[in-house]
């Protein structure tokens, strides 16, 4: 799994764990779970909101890997 996919999968897990409290999901926590550096979120997605948006779209479309 590449870094971008690791970030997406970690974010999806955190979204599932935190439910409606997305504001509690931090970039630092995402990166820790994904095993990547903080700068990679901005590199691949621009910001946390865009990352979360992409993850939610993926969850809705049913393309989540478990």
Task: Show which residues each predicted segment covers.
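Amphipathic alpha-helical linker/stalk segments
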Residues: 55-66
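Alpha-helical DNA-recognition elements
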Residues: 13, 47, 58
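HTH DNA-binding helix-turn interface
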Residues: 17-21, 35, 42-54
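Generic N-terminal leader/processing signal
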Residues: 1-2, 46
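The alpha-helix within a helix-turn-helix
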Residues: 31
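Short, amphipathic alpha-helix enriched in basic
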Residues: 2-28, 39
